[in-house]
A protein has these predicted regions:
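Membrane-embedded alpha-helical bundles that constitute the cytochrome b-like, heme-associated redox core
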Residues: 1-135
Length: 135
């Protein structure tokens, strides 16, 4: 049950990441009317917290459950879970490397958000709609 809520928190923080990332790149200035230094700070901390929320979930999924292929949902979840920290590593590499085209970082960030959304949809959303919604 804790995994569902941690995954949901990570997804909410990923949405914050997408919104603030778009604001940093000059988009959504009216939607996110926060000055640039604060947007940078919110972007960094929401990313750190999102990854922090994924760690207990990943630990449980990797070491207790492992890679599974029982049905299409579980297979999609296992594949997305296999990619999530690899995509994170690529994103962190491009954050610190300035010798890349300007479009690369938003693409990698969007890929990270898509992978987290896939993980959430194939786990927490499924749990909320098929098992139960509650604490």
């Amino acid at each position: 049950m804790f995994k569902v809520w941690f995954a949901t928190a990570a997804l909410v923080l990923a949405v914050v990441q997408v919104m603030t990332g778009a604001r940093i790149f000059g988009k959504l200035e009216r939607v996110v009317p926060i000055p640039r230094p604060q947007v940078n700070r919110v972007h960094r901390w929401s990313g750190r917290l999102a990854i922090l929320c994924t760690l207990p979930v990943a630990f449980h999924c990797i070491f207790i459950l492992g890679f599974q292929t029982t049905n299409a949902r579980v297979l999609a979840h296992s594949i997305a879970g296999s990619f999530v920290y690899g995509v994170l590593a690529v994103k962190l590499f491009f954050v610190h490397d300035r010798a890349h085209p300007r479009w690369v970082l938003p693409v990698v960030g969007g890929t990270m958000a898509a992978v987290l959304t896939t993980l959430w949809a194939t786990s927490a959303l499924w749990y909320f709609t098929n098992v139960r919604f509650g604490f």
